[in-house]
């Protein structure tokens, strides 16, 4: 679009210096913006993916203790590890903002790059619409006025604006805020796991009733608590030494996320008598009370509220930098590439915040189901792009590479694709129709943007750093972006 011909964009060595910074990750005047280091990045990944066991209660409600625990053991191998490995390889191959949009555009063209960007951005905004609502749900028992009416609406608005302002102030601030929030949110579950040991009855973990399993709720709960590993790729250009930092951070993130979901469920289902109907969102606070008393319940409630804020911050960062990356690549209008004096994508933040406010009235379960379906559609495009780039450009530089060949790269994608098919088959008609409409809107938006570009109604251009990189590498044998 505009000045940007992706057929001419040549891939070479994207690292400009020893720190692995990318030309195009920062515009002139923002080069002094501090990059995100390892520890904040791990906690950003943690909050982009899960944020802890809050919401995992539905797995026990849907399938009982045994299948819930097995799900959080097996699911990481089927979904988390393959997605994290692919994200690590692709993010070091293309360490620039935009992440998966760049991968798909490279392999399948900008039309499909825009579609994956649209679906994933919409998923992020839908996801973020949940967090202010859930935050208030955890507090309404202490402050009943927050349950309904004007006080609730005003609280959602104020909370959204405050968290949006934190995103505006810079990714480093968001990262370190995520660290402190993550430590505070997970400490009560570490305490609960220790306190529960004398009360554990292992036989409670083995309860299973295959004839009474809500598979749709079960799979959607697992997927919602363990997906979004690719989100960190959208801000790869903001990471210090991404070719080393990103793979390690993703590895630590997988371990952290898996344990943060499994251990609380292990202690909760093993320490108290089972009543599946009670295992709904927020029930872990009651479990904490039964195990440790009222003080632990209050701590878990405070941790849940804090975790929702952390997930909001991390998700908005990912969504806004995705829009910035798409603009720097010439897929969105140039105005989306503008940064604030703190190096943050101003318009991307405003668009994401507006979407959150518009969607905050939807029901929890419908949001999860619709979001998961859209997310699965985007993941299929990412898996296809990963395999295609492996096949068509095997010699391209990959600072981190999964140690498998073309056949191995296909096999890595098989388990998550099977899971995606299950989610699609089990989805309700209502959710499928809503998701289909959203996809159709994306299909219509791209030609409209092309028309606007042709009429010069809005300006599209590649970031100056990327344009310079393009010019210097036109003769490179490995031309990827098309």
From Swiss-Prot:
<feature type="transmembrane region" description="Helical">
    <location>
        <begin position="429"/>
        <end position="449"/>
    </location>
</feature>
<keyword id="KW-0813">Transport</keyword>
<dbReference type="GO" id="GO:0015846">
    <property type="term" value="P:polyamine transport"/>
</dbReference>
<keyword id="KW-0812">Transmembrane</keyword>
<keyword id="KW-1133">Transmembrane helix</keyword>
<feature type="transmembrane region" description="Helical">
    <location>
        <begin position="367"/>
        <end position="387"/>
    </location>
</feature>
<dbReference type="GO" id="GO:0005886">
    <property type="term" value="C:plasma membrane"/>
</dbReference>
<dbReference type="GO" id="GO:0015293">
    <property type="term" value="F:symporter activity"/>
</dbReference>
<keyword id="KW-0472">Membrane</keyword>
<comment type="similarity">
    <text>Belongs to the amino acid-polyamine-organocation (APC) superfamily. Polyamine:cation symporter (PHS) (TC 2.A.3.12) family.</text>
</comment>
<comment type="function">
    <text>Probable cell membrane polyamine/proton symporter involved in the polyamine uptake in cells.</text>
</comment>
<feature type="transmembrane region" description="Helical">
    <location>
        <begin position="254"/>
        <end position="274"/>
    </location>
</feature>
<keyword id="KW-0769">Symport</keyword>
<feature type="transmembrane region" description="Helical">
    <location>
        <begin position="66"/>
        <end position="86"/>
    </location>
</feature>
<dbReference type="InterPro" id="IPR044566">
    <property type="entry name" value="RMV1-like"/>
</dbReference>
<dbReference type="InterPro" id="IPR002293">
    <property type="entry name" value="AA/rel_permease1"/>
</dbReference>
<feature type="transmembrane region" description="Helical">
    <location>
        <begin position="171"/>
        <end position="191"/>
    </location>
</feature>
<feature type="transmembrane region" description="Helical">
    <location>
        <begin position="94"/>
        <end position="114"/>
    </location>
</feature>
<dbReference type="GO" id="GO:0015203">
    <property type="term" value="F:polyamine transmembrane transporter activity"/>
</dbReference>
<protein>
    <recommendedName>
        <fullName>Probable polyamine transporter At1g31820</fullName>
    </recommendedName>
</protein>
<feature type="transmembrane region" description="Helical">
    <location>
        <begin position="344"/>
        <end position="364"/>
    </location>
</feature>
<keyword id="KW-1003">Cell membrane</keyword>
<feature type="transmembrane region" description="Helical">
    <location>
        <begin position="294"/>
        <end position="314"/>
    </location>
</feature>
<dbReference type="Pfam" id="PF13520">
    <property type="entry name" value="AA_permease_2"/>
</dbReference>
<feature type="transmembrane region" description="Helical">
    <location>
        <begin position="406"/>
        <end position="426"/>
    </location>
</feature>
<feature type="transmembrane region" description="Helical">
    <location>
        <begin position="143"/>
        <end position="163"/>
    </location>
</feature>
<feature type="transmembrane region" description="Helical">
    <location>
        <begin position="36"/>
        <end position="56"/>
    </location>
</feature>
């Amino acid at each position: 679009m505009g000045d940007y011909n992706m057929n001419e964009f040549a891939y070479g060595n994207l690292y400009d210096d020893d720190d692995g910074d990318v030309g195009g990750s920062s515009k002139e005047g923002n080069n002094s913006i501090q990059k995100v280091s390892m520890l904040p990045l791990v906690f950003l990944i943690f909050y982009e993916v899960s944020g802890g066991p809050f919401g995992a209660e539905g797995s026990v409600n849907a399938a009982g203790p045994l299948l819930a625990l097995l799900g959080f053991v097996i699911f990481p191998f089927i979904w988390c590890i393959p997605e994290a490995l692919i994200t690590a390889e692709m993010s070091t191959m293309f360490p620039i903002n935009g992440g998966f949009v760049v991968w798909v555009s490279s392999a399948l063209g900008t039309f499909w790059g825009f579609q994956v960007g649209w679906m994933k951005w919409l998923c992020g905004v839908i996801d973020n619409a949940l967090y202010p609502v859930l935050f208030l749900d955890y507090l309404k028992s202490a402050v009943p006025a927050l349950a309904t009416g004007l006080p609730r609406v005003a609280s959602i608005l104020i909370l959204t604006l405050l968290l949006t302002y934190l995103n505006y102030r810079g990714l480093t601030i968001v990262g370190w805020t995520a660290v402190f929030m993550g430590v505070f949110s997970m400490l009560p579950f570490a305490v609960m796991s220790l306190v529960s040991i004398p009360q554990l009855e292992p036989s409670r973990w083995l309860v299973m009733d295959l004839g009474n399993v809500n598979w749709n709720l079960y799979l959607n709960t697992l997927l919602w608590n363990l997906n979004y590993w690719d989100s960190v790729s959208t801000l790869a250009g903001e990471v210090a030494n991404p070719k080393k930092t990103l793979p390690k951070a993703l590895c630590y993130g997988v371990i952290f996320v898996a344990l943060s979901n499994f251990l609380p469920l292990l202690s909760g289902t093993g320490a108290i008598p089972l009543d599946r109907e009670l295992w709904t969102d927020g029930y872990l606070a009651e479990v904490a009370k039964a195990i440790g008393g009222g003080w632990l319940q209050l701590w878990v409630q405070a941790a849940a509220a804090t975790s929702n804020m952390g997930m909001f911050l991390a998700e908005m960062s990912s969504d806004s930098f995705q829009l910035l990356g798409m603009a720097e690549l010439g897929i969105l209008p140039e105005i989306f590439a503008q940064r604030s004096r703190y190096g943050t994508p101003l318009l991307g933040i405003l668009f994401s915040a507006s979407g959150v406010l518009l969607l905050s009235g939807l029901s929890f379960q419908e949001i999860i189901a619709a979001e998961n379906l859209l997310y699965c559609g985007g993941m299929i495009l990412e898996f296809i792009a990963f395999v295609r780039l492996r096949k068509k450009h095997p010699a391209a530089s990959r600072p981190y590479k999964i140690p498998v060949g073309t056949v191995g790269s296909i096999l890595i994608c098989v388990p998550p694709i099977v899971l995606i098919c299950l989610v699609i088959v089990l989805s309700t008609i209502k959710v499928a129709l809503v998701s289909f409409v959203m996809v159709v809107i994306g299909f219509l938006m791209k030609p409209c943007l092309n028309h606007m570009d042709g009429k010069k109604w809005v300006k599209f251009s590649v970031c100056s750093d990327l344009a310079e990189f393009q010019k210097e590498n036109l003769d490179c044998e490995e031309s990827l972006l098309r």
